[in-house]
Design a protein with these regions (language model features):
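Recognition helix of helix-turn-helix/homeodomain-like DNA-binding domains
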Residues: 1-10, 72-88
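Conserved hydrophobic/aromatic packing and binding residues within compact polymer-binding modules
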Residues: 1-3, 29, 53, 67-68, ...
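Short coil turns linking two alpha-helices in DNA-binding domains
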Residues: 11, 25, 63, 74-77, ...
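DNA major-groove recognition helix of helix-turn-helix/homeodomain DNA-binding modules
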Residues: 13-28, 91-106
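Short basic helix-loop element that most often maps to the first helix and adjoining turn
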Residues: 17, 51-66, 70, 95
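Short amphipathic recognition helices of helix-turn-helix/homeodomain-type DNA-binding modules
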Residues: 28-37, 106-115
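A short, Lys/Arg-rich alpha-helix, primarily the initiator
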Residues: 36-59
Length: 115
């Protein structure tokens, strides 16, 4: 696990397992929502995450390159996330959640509520 600002980041796969085990939502775990009830058990689907990342990018009219610059990564990494070849890193997912005020549960395909 990486440390950022003195806090350990939980890999999304492990966070999903934790949320499934205790019926929590991810937004509660990262501290952006007070409601803690989860919405059932879910597995991470890299293609769904990629689709939602693309949807978010289109909604805010930004290119893969612009998102890559925001996350301090490469355009090819964003492309790999969007195509579902790779699951997005927790640190990148959190940056997106905080910058665009979207739900981590939505980004990870656990709810249809974007906010």
């Amino acid at each position: 696990m990486k440390k950022e600002n003195g806090k350990e980041l939980i890999p999304l796969k492990k966070m999903t397992e934790l949320c499934n085990c205790f019926n929590l939502n991810m937004d509660y775990v990262i501290g952006i929502k007070r409601e803690h009830n989860g919405n059932g058990k879910h597995l991470l689907d890299s293609k769904e995450i990629g689709s939602r990342l693309r949807c978010l990018r289109k909604k805010y009219n930004i290119t893969q390159r612009q998102l890559a610059e925001l996350l301090h990564t490469s355009q090819s990494t964003i492309s790999a996330y969007e195509s579902g070849k790779t699951i997005i890193l927790t640190a990148f997912a959190l940056q997106i959640v905080y910058k665009y005020h979207v739900s981590l549960d939505w980004l990870c395909g656990r709810t249809e509520d974007m906010y």
